[in-house]
Amino acid sequence: MIKIDNLKLSKENIDILSEYKIELTAIKLKKIDTTVESYIEDIYKYLEYIEEKKHIYSALNIKEEDIIDYLTYLDKNNYEKTSIVRKIVSIKLFHKYLSEKYHIEDISIKIDKPRVRRKLPNILSIEEVDNLLDIELNNAFDYRNKAMLELMYSSGLRVSELVDLKLKDIDLDNGYVKCFGKGNKERIVPVGELAVEYLKKYIYEYRDSMKKGYYTENIFLNNHGKKISRQGFFLIIKDIAKQKNIDKNITPHMLRHSFATHLLNNGADLRTIQEMLGHSSITTTQIYTNVSTDILKENYELYKRRD
């Protein structure tokens, strides 16, 4: 977390940034703290450049060409396009705030965000998923891992949604889970039969032995009897992939991407996938159509070589 009082900026810019942080925190109460911190860090780096390179010591005196110079500097120093876009959003929000608070011109109004081609998500083939999920079941931890992987692949949950699941959030008789996604938005997601089978096995036969005397509503527990963390699950899936000799840099999110792509390839419509993934916009979901097209092209090229 940035401590504004310790920043190497002019006193005026420190005061402006302090007031801006208070304003941001007030209007973004429903957002996580890291969102505000990210905005503030972006603006600190921006003002630091403006002071060092342009010798302008008040944000109120910045001109449009100064913003352009800063963005050019970022581009020349090989910042990722996505990072530059985020910084532009931060800068435009900051100058909009300055314009409204100090009744000055919004000099960022003509600054456009560059178009960024979204990177296609990495996915696993159905064979790789089957291999990953084919776990040897010898103890409570194996059954927990099996239940988590089956649930994630059959429902497309985010990792945070998976590890946050509580006993009251699941209806195994009807095959549904209730989860809370971005913005604490609730959605109900159907769960596959295999996932239900291994969830029942884990919860009814093994979970109690993992509690270590703690009481918790969280379904998935670590070896200390507490809620498993996102990082904990990340390490588990890495270890399983290594044991299975899967030659890919597997992350938990790849299961979510694979779930969506395999659904689409098997005829599911985008709206259904959007609802299951919890995307607020179908534009986000449409990225999977590009993945499917790429797979189709690869298969076509493969068959061409066989002619």
Question: What do these predicted ranges mean?
Answer:
Residues 1-307:
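Conserved catalytic core of the tyrosine transesterase superfamily
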